[in-house]
From Swiss-Prot:
Residues 119-130 have a biased composition (Acidic residues). NCBIfam families: S6. Belongs to the bacterial ribosomal protein bS6 family. Residues 104-116 have a biased composition (Basic and acidic residues). Binds together with bS18 to 16S ribosomal RNA. It comes from Yersinia pestis. This is Small ribosomal subunit protein bS6. One of its GO terms (biological process) is translation. The lineage of its organism: Bacteria, Pseudomonadati, Pseudomonadota, Gammaproteobacteria, Enterobacterales.
Length: 130
């Protein structure tokens, strides 16, 4: 089986349906004896340019190993689902399992914020002891 990287963008008004979509598309891959190596929900993000007069979309990234029939079924589902405003399926040479740069940057920001919060908590605790 081949490895694919799949990104699809969902209409921002349909963001609450994204978990169901992810579940449905994941089931399509696993039912066809495929494997999901990485699944990332990037959330609602600003678009580089308007698509159908929209300026934001909900992004989802999948790295999968699946047969061609499963990929064809996914592309058909994307095409006929009005909530999916754009999708892209690319074949890649190897399975990608590490976190994407988007998630790494988000984790770094979270760690910095947590570290800053801990530093503030420590300084406040030191002030109250005096």
């Amino acid at each position: 089986m081949r490895h694919y990287e799949i990104v699809f963008m969902v209409h921002p008004d349909q963001s609450e349906q994204v978990p169901g979509m992810i579940e449905r598309y994941s089931a399509t891959i696993t039912n066809a004896a495929g494997t999901i190596h990485r699944l990332e929900d990037w959330g609602r993000r600003q678009l580089a340019y308007p698509i159908n007069k929209l300026h934001k979309a909900h992004y989802v990234l999948l790295n999968v190993e699946a047969p061609q029939e499963a990929i064809d079924e996914l592309e058909t589902n994307f095409r006929f689902n009005d909530a999916v405003i754009r999708s892209m399926v690319m074949r890649v040479k190897h399975a990608v399992t590490e976190a994407s740069p988007m998630v790494k940057a988000k984790d770094e920001r979270r760690e910095r914020h947590d570290f800053a919060s801990e530093a503030n908590d420590d300084s406040e605790a030191g002030d109250s002891e005096e």
